[in-house]
Amino acid sequence: MNEIERRRTFAIISHPDAGKTTLTEKLLLFGGQIQVAGAVKNNKIKKTATSDWMEIEKQRGISVTTSVVEFDYGDYKVNILDTPGHQDFAEDTFRTLTAVDSAIIVVDSAKGVEAQTRKLMTVCRMRKTPVIIFINKMDREGKDPFDLLDELEQELQIKVRPLSWPINQGQRFKGVYNIYEQRLDLFTPDKQKVTEKVEVDIHSDALENHVGDADAEKLRMDLELVDGVYPSFDVTRYGNGEVARVFLGAAWITWGGKGLWACFVKIAPSPHPIQAEERMVRPEEPKFSGFIFKITANIDPNHRSCIAFCKVCSGKFVRNAPYLHVRQNKTLRFSSPTQFMAQKKSTIDEAWPGDIVGLPDNGIFKIGDTLTEGEMIHFRGLPSFSPEMFKYIENADPMKTKQLNKGIEQLMDEGVAQLFVNQFNGRKIIGTVGQLQFEVIQYRLENEYNAQCRWEPVSLYKACWIESDDEAQLEAFKKRKYQFMAKDREGRDVFLADSNYVLQMAQSDFEHIKFHFTSEF
């Protein structure tokens, strides 16, 4: 197995509170990276998840930024990107999906498919990302497994194939039958872990000895139905994102995660070709190429440092080698590239396709930037969507203006939110997906940059990026709508409509102007 074939790079994504970060912790435990998984069950236990490294994440018990964890597991090199589950941070998750080769979607067995899960599955479908679905919390009362599978197919518009099956659920949960490895994983409630792994023929009497007569009979009937209704395991269809593999379990118990983990590493794809604007880039190509999908400021609060996360797409990244920054047409060398365990970094000498490399950033990178050995190529990313909430940001401490401006600039570079400058009054407007992002921005400005800000309401409905082949009409529109015009950070014209009616009237009155609801067109 060569270096490319042994790479596994994936994201763990889900609706809030489905147990995604808990599952990540268990995978780290199985990979030997941590001795005890951070208890994220409730706030009384003062441990925090290893992948939740920001202070605000530790305080609130939620993930607010994608974290990267890399480790060896058997013959494989694994890169996990643990994403924010809260819907306010959907854009960070969308960007993360540009950098992975496959994804685990975590679904709560009681709640089933939720709005956030549907949205994320849409992005996976757009990129044909192979998907494994982990139905979590089978040790609690929830929906019937067959009902959940029907819901997954209908709501996520993807065929499913179960590779494990629960033996009862809720208080009667006894464990799982691993269909993929034809093995029983049994669970004793008072020990909260797998007590026994048994290879057993489900048609033999030995099954009754382990789970009892009633559960043995039900398991046989369920598995017969699974084989009759759902497609057989097909690696090609899974790799094309046409069929999702489904596992059922309970992430906070050591069972389920490990069965999923061993199977997932075996069937997950190695790095795949990536479409650039100019051509298809293949991982086995000899020359290095990669793109920046995330920027994080203050990953170490003791040092005001920025780290750009680079996904290696082809060739081999080598420390201190000269690489072309395509957007700026400059040659750069990196003396201290790093790999990650949440906020803990270690310097590396080389990296291969599928790896995530941390590059020191002093303001030269933007999300979507490409690095190559000289070729002028541009990787396609995901666009920014029109924000759903808008507020003016004002300086609450005039003595800290410099710190505030630097903080806003770095947080916007990270993609925490979007910044617009109103052309009419010059005021800065922050656009976000939800209210929690405003709180995170205010918290981070105060704690990381020693700057104070306050929010003022502004009544806006939608941000529209505008363009037109008719220069005269474009200028006429900008003149008439001057008080609603803004510039984004790239200097592009943005129309800030304050209502759906105003937007529709503008589209009707100016037929030659194109109104875009994403920043890439």
What are these regions (language model features)?
Residues 1-521:
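Structural and coupling elements of P-loop NTPases
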